[in-house]
Amino acid sequence: MIFQSFILDNLVSLCLKIINSVIVVGLYYGFMTTFSTGPSYLFLLRAHVMEEGTEKKISATTGFITGQLVMFISIYYAPLHIALDRPHTITVITLPYLLLYFLGNNQKNFLNYVYKNQNSIRHFSIQRIFFQNLFFQLLNPFFLPSSILMRLANIYIFQSNNKVLFLTSSFVGWLIGHVFFMKWIGLMLVWIQEKNNSIKSTVAIRSNKGVLAKFRKSMFQIFLIFFFITCLYYLGRIPPIYFFTPKMSEIKERGEIEKREGEIDIEINSQRAGSKQEQKITAEEKLSPYLFSKKNNNLDKIKEENDIFGFQKPLVTILFDYNRWNRPLRYIKNDRFENVVRNEISQFFFFTCQSDGKERISFTYPPNLSTFQKMMEMKISLFTRDIISYEELSNSWRSTNEEKKKKLTNEFLNRVEVLDKESLPVDIFENRIRLCNDEKKQKYLTKEYDPFLNGPCRGQIQKWFSPPIQKETYKKNSLFINKIHGILFSNTNNYPKFEQKKNIFDRKSLLTDINFFFNLITKFSRKSVSSLNFEGLYLFPKDNKGKMSSKKKKFLFDTIRPDLNDNKIVNLQKCIGINEIVKKLPRWSYNLIDELEQLEGKKKVEYHQIRSRKAKRVVLLTKNSQNDDNYDETTDTDNTEKKKELALIRYSQQPDFRRDIIKGSIRAQRRKTVTCKLFQRSVDSPLFLEKMEKTSFFCFDILDSSKIFFMFKNWIRKKKELKNSDYTDEKAKESQKKEEEKIKKNEKEEKRRIEIGEAWDSIIFAQVIRGCLLITQSILRKYILLPSLIITKNIVRILLFQFPEWSEDFRDWQREMYIKCTYNGVQLSETEFPKKWLTDGIQIKILFPFRLKPWHRSKLRFTEKKKDPLKNKKVKKKNFCFLTIFGMEVELPFSGYPRNRFSFFDPILKELKKKMKKLKNNFFLILKIVNERTKNFITTLKETSKRIIQSILKKVLFLNKKIKKLYNYLFLFRFKKIDELNQNKKNFPITKNNPIIYESTILIQAINKTNCSLTEKKIKAINAKTKKIIKKIERMTKENKGGFLISEINSNSKKTSSNTKGLELEKKILQILQRRNVQLTHKLYSFFKFLLNFMKKVYTDIFLCIVSVPRINVQFFLESTKKIINQSIYNKKTNEEIIDKTNQSIIHFISIINKSSNTKNTNSAANSYEVSALSQAYVFFKISQIQVLNVYKYKFKYVFDYDGRSFFIKDEIKDYFFGIQGIIHSKLRHKNSPVSLKNQWTNWLKVHYQYDLSQNRWSRLVQKNLKNRINKHRLDQNKDLTKCDSYKKTQLIVSKNKKQQVDFLVNLLIQKKIKKQSRYDLLLYKFINYAEKKELSIYGYRSPFQANKKRAISYDYNTQKKEFFDRMDDISIKNYIAEDAIRYIEQNRDRKYFDWVVMDVKIQNNSISNLQFSFFFKFLRFYDAYRNKPWIIPIKFLFLHFSVNQNFNKIKNIIEKKRRIDIFKPWKKKKILEVELETPNRAKKEYTSRVDLNKPSLSNQEKDIEEDYGESDSKKGGKDKNKKKYKNKIEAEVNLLLRKYLNFHLNWKGSLNKRVINNVKVYCLLIRLKNIKQIAISSIQRGELSLDIMMIQNEKDSTLTGFRKKKEFIEKGIFIIEPVRLSRKNNEQFFMYETARLLLIHKSKRQINQRNPEKSDLDKQIFYKNIPPKRDQRITQNKEKKHYALVVIENILSARRRRELRILICFNPRSINSMPRKTIFDNENKINNCCQVFAKNKDLDKEKKILMNLKLILWPNYRLEDLACINRYWFDTYNGSRFSIVRIHMYPRLKMR
């Protein structure tokens, strides 16, 4: 066993060491980089395949490996990396190599004429191959960007300690991978060659050697082309030549303007100097031999050098400018700065610094500070730092912190002690100090420049104090203000504009400073400054004071004004002096604008550089300031600047994938993006294509018998003409469907129109072509096509001998108007073209389009013929259209279907149809008459013919009778002869031997059918005939036997008589007829049988379908009801068993949960719930329903046996699991004895300091009236299904009287819900820190739940749980009882547990999105958790008080609540509803008062803020005497709005958008026309101009206040004023007030003084005067105004001192000696980078406990701004994004016993 463990341990440790070693990691990463191939591999493979000779192959591989080695070295060696990364390297390497490669391939003996040996190394081709592979390996990252495999080594090298070893191992790994790769390629080439040889051997093809030779030569040219293309791949991204770019032209223009301004300034200065030359001769003579006498010469030399460098600089950047303006992909813009910050450079800079008494690596150290420190150490020996030991640093840091902390804590504790004495001295609260100049006059600085309020301003300000009224003129003060200060306060108008003044200085005091300054210059400057005249330094005259000129002051100082827009700012490039070392942010050297700015006309620039959303500027109206009636563009050039344009910006609806990209910049290589449609909103990923909705083009539905039946049934129903009661409903539904289909069709048509318009807009030069085509079509139509049609029509009329209609036709032709419109359809005029119509597009609208008519009717005839308006219900067609490029007419632009034109032949055809109808009518009358006469004639003929035929038939019958008589006589005579012959035959033997056998006749039996049919009758008739014939034959035979004599006939004769033949024929015919009849009857029978069977089958199927449908439905209903009944019976049985074995309270819990979940499920069907939202009862009830195995029982037993969790599980649950499942241990079982219950909960509650009430206070709580009142309140609250009171608790505290005890504990248990969240948090902390089985006391502070053990355990059950922003514990800390609070407890239910059943409806109605997270289901879970848990919604206490929309949205929920109140107890909550309805009305009044523009007023809250922080902006605006005069009312009122609210939305109602836009289009046309009447009336008739929208009639009311006064605008929603709540102008006071409110805690939240809360009311006007009055002040309405029921200890100290004390408490000096944790950021010098502030120390003392308890009060949880406070305090940094400078464990983890 020992040997086995030894082996295993060694193997594991050895494997871990090998895997984690630098060599293995380097080999792995180097091998992985082999797979990052580039164009260099192509040249290497080309050399191995195409080149002949081993020397060339070796040179190619050596060049390739050398290039890769250089790339690996460049990762470690920074100068080499910078050199290879510079853009000039590409131009230096590629361009000369291209030349050499071209010459080497085209000239065979180029540089090789001396060396005849082709395989020599000195041969140029071998060198060329070597350098080719080397250069391409270096240029690989430029041409084809390196993959992630190549970047792995670059990433890991920053994490490895031994960087050189890692690089060498990675290079070796790459070399191994390269060898394997080349070997594999060699094997592939050999296999391909063998395959080709085998093919050549089998197929004998004579190869053409000349073709192969040409192909081999062409390969060189192909590779040359490929090489040139790869070079251009990167070089092609460079913009055009620098001099021809638009930015260069702008820079040149700016330079010329600056030069002109400089010349003008020099001329003005020279003129002023000449005028005052005589006065200043003595002063110049005195100052001439001194320091600045020869400065100008030196300045001229430096300027010349700068000019030379400025001339040479563009020559370098002609081919490549790495700072070019289109280099970045994105452009982060900031209007406050002149240029834009570059975003691709990292802001992190690593350097060592001292922090917390240790030397650490800081990655946010200012780089300029480190460079300055190095420069000082290199140049001057005085600035070298002494190396301080680790212990000295820690000791000094610890001592300073200890001293600071002791002072602050002592001061703080002294103030608290004074508060405990219940006295009210003035000095308890530390007030904020403000800087004053004079105490008597009370002149103090403004808030912007007060260092105690806003930090140091770093400037010199004199006599600028706010309380006294300032004069209009200010004195010229000296000002050297910081650049940052000037930038930040450039837009504010709360301080005066300072002017520069000549500074008066003391020359003698300046001498030493100047000497030291020039000594510094000699140290730092490369060139000597001996040319400066130092002789005059000591030759100052004896005058103590003098004046310095402004030019000489620029030599030393760099001045800047606060206002950046001032033209008098000193040009910093021309100033020479000390460069201030500040943190220089990398900025672009260009200031770019986007397309929108160019369209809006903010900056007058010819070209924009940033692409924005595709938009076009549509000019609606161009107004000239001199002449209002002249709107044409053909004006003089002098008047063009005076024009004012009314324009709109039209945005394209195409998907915008450009996203503010700079023109000409490198595009991001976007992969895995698919565009499935021609026009789609966004790019889709192929991963989600399956989840997208796809339209199916074909539908394959299998037709079942039931479907056929229903289709047949519907078809029958349609044929029926019965009118049911549902007929009208069906008609309404059909009409509604038709309307919906019509709307959908219009939407599709609109979408199609937009797509066509966008397509025209996206194609290059499409708008130019389309515009030209439209204009040509309009000209052709107006002047060629229509006149030619008029001429031809009238000529034809003349030829047809009709009068021509020239005047009528030309009148209609002149009426047709062609109005030029914008691309959107906004009408301009006939002559005015829209601006940039060739690029932006144009539409041509035809008003009163011409219709060629064959004839014109007279007006009298037209007016006489009037139709009934009721009958004429057809809608009139629009009398306008738009022209297309094909000359067609459409109703709307880009409509797909052309308009049906009025045909010239339509009226002719109508007339012809009318005439044809008349002819038809006449013809049919004639036909009718003819038909009647022919019918009469035919009837008479029939009658006569019948008579004739009857007479003939009678005669024929008479003849037939006579013939029959004759025949009978003859027949009898014949039979006599036959008898005689028969008797003679009897004598012959033949007759005896051969007797005649007569055929027996068989009667045809009829079919036994009950129904008599035609076939049966026929059969009967045939049978009767056959019977008659048989009887005749029998009778005749009898007569023959009677003795007729027949003559003898010879028996040998073969002839028979004619009589016998006739009989046989008749016999045969009868037999044939009988057979045919029988066959026919049989066939008819089978046919009828088949037909009957078929009909029977069809009808039975139909009948079965009819019967089966209700049978199936009934069966399904019965089965479902049976299941429901069985399930309900089973549930009832299980519930009865649970009721018998468990406590009744659990049923109450579950019923409430079921009700709440049911009400919630009605709103959202598929919501996922979090486990934390469920209660214990619900979870354990679900567990109990599962058949738990023994294994799981033991697991649950382990859960319940854990001593920490038993207090969090309810006793009912424990009893249930103990009694039924047998899981819980018996000692944890709930006992009914009060003593055991008290002992059980005292172990838990002894750490809760809230249960700290006195006995007197407790006795007040036990009163019966108070108890009953709370009980009623809680019962009502439970009926409302509120989440906060859905639990019942067990008993906790025992009093002396058992009756009072039971009643009291029942009421008290309700408050246990408030403690649920805190206990749950503690359970989580305990579970997380279970491994560290150490007590909480090691951290040195008391638990927030620790209480006084001497006092009785009690709790205030009237706690109002309000949710403020101190979540240190979720239990209320108020320990006093106020009857007022109980009285208004429902009104003040603004606590953590809201009525989430009501709020959930509101949240789900206002859902954020309808996305279905198919792949990322975790996001859906979090989203649903936020929807279903309204208690995590932020409380309105933080937000602005004028957000009225939120209050208006609450009215729905209040109305719903009112319904439920009416159901339960309306008389109880009537008052509550009134109070809740008051707040929206009050907010509405407040809102309207704020929107009032005539009387701008502020809310009470803002007035309170103004009293503390000074006058408001509106008051300051009133005092301003130099107020700007506005030209019109609208401009003045808009500025008034912007002054107060910064921005407003003035928008129309959505339902009126289309109508309003149509009105605007007509207005734009009517404004330009002179004769408006005709077109206005026609547009009103057509419905384009709606009169109900035209409310604005007078110019006097066309102002914002005029709109507000009219109720019609607001009621109809035409004019809406909505404030944008994003930001406010100069609102520092408001934000400071809101920040201060976070520190405040309301009086209903906590109460520190346990003994007497009324005595602890102190004067808190400093903090509470900003708080607006709330409903909670009803509690203290009978008390004094100056006293409040709260003391917040944190507010005793000022904000700055409080912050300092927090920081010092965090930096615990006692934890310095503990060893720090090792992190991955430790470097070779072992500089610690992280420390554990809160170390585990068991030696606890009293002082430390006090300090840590103070920390709990002074350091609230969830205060991220304190991180920034530490940052600014400790390192004096101003960048708020650096939260990770000091890495400390600020919030300790809670650990319970």
Curated annotation (Swiss-Prot):
It is a multi-pass membrane protein. Residues 1504-1524 are annotated as: Disordered. Its main location: plastid. The chain crosses the membrane at residues 11-31, 64-84, 90-112, 129-149, 172-192, 222-242. InterPro entries: TIC214. GO terms for biological process: protein transport. One of its GO terms (cellular component) is chloroplast inner membrane. Keywords: Chloroplast, Membrane, Plastid, Plastid inner membrane, Protein transport, Transmembrane, Transmembrane helix, Transport. The keyword Cytoplasm does not apply. It is found in: Plastid, Chloroplast inner membrane. Belongs to the TIC214 family. Involved in protein precursor import into chloroplasts. May be part of an intermediate translocation complex acting as a protein-conducting channel at the inner envelope. Part of the Tic complex. This is Protein TIC 214. The gene is TIC214.
